[in-house]
Amino acid sequence: MSKRDYYEVLGVAKTASESELKVAFRKLAMVHHPDRNPGDKEAEIKFKEVNEAYQCLSDGQKRAAYDRFGHAAFSQGGAGGPGFGNEFGDFMSDIFENFFGDGRAAPGGGAGRGRGGAPGRERGSDLRYNLEISLEEAFAGKTETIRIPTSIACETCSGTGAKAGSKPRTCSTCGGYGRVRAAQGFFAIERTCPNCHGRGEVVDDPCTACSGAGRVNRERTLSINVPAGVDDGLRIRLAGEGESGMRGGTAGDLYVFLSIKPHPFFQRDGADLFCRVPISMVTAALSGEITVPVIDGSQTQVRIPAGTQTGKQFRIKSKGMPVLRSREVGDLYIQVSVETPQNLTKRQRELLQEFDQSASDENHPESAGFFSKVRDFFVSGATRA
């Protein structure tokens, strides 16, 4: 049975670059991998075909020979067929470690290697801390001292987990790699070592201070710089302030999630602040000045023109929130609400009634216009009927 063209197998053009070949191979290898298609002989055949095509075309000399002579270049007496060396095994390990997680399959043999560097090293876990601050603190910025429970390297054993005077020994099952491989036909299935649980080392005489864990629980005190202008939901990352790593692994990170308490006066939209201020009917009708609060703790005056209605908005420039890591500042918007007087005395009622009797449509243009439209609507409706 004749072999398919290698370029056709990978679905690339004959001018494909090395990176294009690699992308095509990764995609097809994941689709046809036997772990994703258990018991599917056709998938296994296609997977082998994809491997063979890539091994040829990814090698400069073999690709040149293939481009010139085709499959005949690798027949008996030719340049030699595509093989599966250690470099390919490492490349496949990288692919399937990302895709399949702890249990992976890769062509070829060889011992496994930890992703984080030397075998057995384990990165510390990331930590999360929720911090609630006031809007005033978000405006000015602050330094907050927090206390967090975490795990740190055991000082007694320096994080090795072994008792003083002893040290961990290399795992005899995996040879210190933390993983073992079992050959299954064409493939080698790689899994975490059952003896050392991926550490690559075995502690025979554990440290009494940490019970062999290499870490102990402690509470740490940290200072967090909260910059001015932070918004609700912002995340601050403190690199290396998470849990300590295991057996020389790097520490995790600390993520501080900010939330801002609701404010009694201000609502926030980005860098702008909004404040609803009640004004008297007289001030709204005759004009006047009102005093309004500012987020920095000061106050400012706002001139209310005669005839101001509920919902009228006044803008005060640069009295809002600072923009994070910028010199820009938002604005403060004052929205007035005309308050209708309550609990009137007899004399106050009489004065309002006198005003109402003397008022004309010019004094209430919106009301007059609205009811005029309503009247016209019903009159025209009756005419159509």
Curated annotation (Swiss-Prot):
Zn(2+) 1 binds at residues 154, 157, 207, 210. This is Chaperone protein DnaJ. InterPro entries: DnaJ, DnaJ_C, DnaJ_domain, DnaJ_domain_CS, HSP40/DnaJ_pept-bd, HSP_DnaJ_Cys-rich_dom, HSP_DnaJ_Cys-rich_dom_sf, J_dom_sf. Participates actively in the response to hyperosmotic and heat shock by preventing the aggregation of stress-denatured proteins and by disaggregating proteins, also in an autonomous, DnaK-independent fashion. Unfolded proteins bind initially to DnaJ; upon interaction with the DnaJ-bound protein, DnaK hydrolyzes its bound ATP, resulting in the formation of a stable complex. GrpE releases ADP from DnaK; ATP binding to DnaK triggers the release of the substrate protein, thus completing the reaction cycle. Its cofactor is Zn(2+). Keywords: Chaperone, Cytoplasm, DNA replication, Metal-binding, Repeat, Stress response, Zinc, Zinc-finger. GO terms for biological process: chaperone cofactor-dependent protein refolding; DNA replication; protein refolding; response to heat. CXXCXGXG motif repeats lie at residues 154-161, 171-178, 193-200, 207-214.
